[in-house]
Amino acid sequence: MAYRKLGRDSAHRKAMLREMTTQLIMNERIVTTETRAKEIRKTTEKMITLGKRGDLSARRKAAAFVRNEIADIHEEKDAVVVKSALQKLFSDIAPRYKDRNGGYTRMYKLANPRKGDAAPMVIIELV
């Protein structure tokens, strides 16, 4: 399987991809460099596909990759509801794409590169 090294060793690269994929699931839009976004797109598509499957095996595979962070806190009636990134993936995001076969993310190139190293920046978001 081909992938980009992104100037990091394998553990650092995997941690970065896990973190950025989790942030994309939680916020549904992030700003990052173009090469990172292309890699995040792959992992996010796989996680959403697992979310669409929705069985126990898919939940365990997604839980092994997506970080356990709080995605949403809101009040319903007299209770405070706390939703993790994994719960948001399976209950909110996956049902949204039940009739869509892939292509869950979209990338927009930003006009101005990053200051300092002139890296091309993009916005990656869920469709």
Swiss-Prot record:
Keywords: Ribonucleoprotein, Ribosomal protein. It comes from Lactobacillus johnsonii (strain CNCM I-12250 / La1 / NCC 533). InterPro entries: Ribosomal_bL17 (IPR000456), Ribosomal_bL17_CS (IPR047859), Ribosomal_bL17_sf (IPR036373). Part of the 50S ribosomal subunit. Contacts protein L32. This is Large ribosomal subunit protein bL17. SUPFAM superfamilies: Prokaryotic ribosomal protein L17 (SSF64263). GO terms for biological process: translation. It comes from the Bacteria. PANTHER family: LARGE RIBOSOMAL SUBUNIT PROTEIN BL17M (PTHR14413:SF16), RIBOSOMAL PROTEIN L17 (PTHR14413). GO terms for cellular component: cytosolic large ribosomal subunit. Signal peptide: none annotated. Belongs to the bacterial ribosomal protein bL17 family. The gene is rplQ. GO terms for molecular function: structural constituent of ribosome. Gene3D superfamilies: Ribosomal protein L17.
